[in-house]
Design a protein with these regions (language model features):
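Intrinsic disorder/low-complexity detector
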Residues: 1-2, 46, 74, 86-104
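An amphipathic, aromatic/His-enriched active-site/gating alpha helix that lines ligand/cofactor pockets
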Residues: 20-38, 57-95
């Protein structure tokens, strides 16, 4: 199991756009083979207010390629991305894979 970590930079004045994307995209991700660990928005009392994180478990890096293709072909995903783009909320997205350290 690997975890896809997506780091979002966004316009804090348009946080509603990214929050709606997170809410709407969850069923698409699950349907495409990912398992949502969670989407995380910043608090207003500590740290940067223009960064968010999405964590998605994927069975393996090789499965990720199929997941990405199913996601790209999904009409609901396309609509979600179009709505996010139209909102002007996102500045950038960076994807990386991370692994869990076992809890002792």
């Amino acid at each position: 199991m690997v975890t896809l970590c997506i780091r979002y930079k966004f316009n804090p004045d348009k946080i509603t756009g990214i929050q709606e994307y997170f809410e709407n995209e969850q069923r698409v991700i699950e349907r495409s083979g990912g398992k949502i660990v969670g989407y995380f928005l910043p608090t207003d009392f500590a740290g940067p207010t223009d960064e968010a994180i999405g964590l998605i478990d994927i069975p393996s890096v090789s499965v990720y390629e199929d997941y990405r293709q199913r996601l790209a072909d999904d009409p609901e995903h396309k609509a979600n991305v179009a709505a996010l783009t139209a909102s002007g909320a996102t500045v950038s997205m960076v994807r990386s894979f991370i692994r869990r350290v076992p809890v002792q």
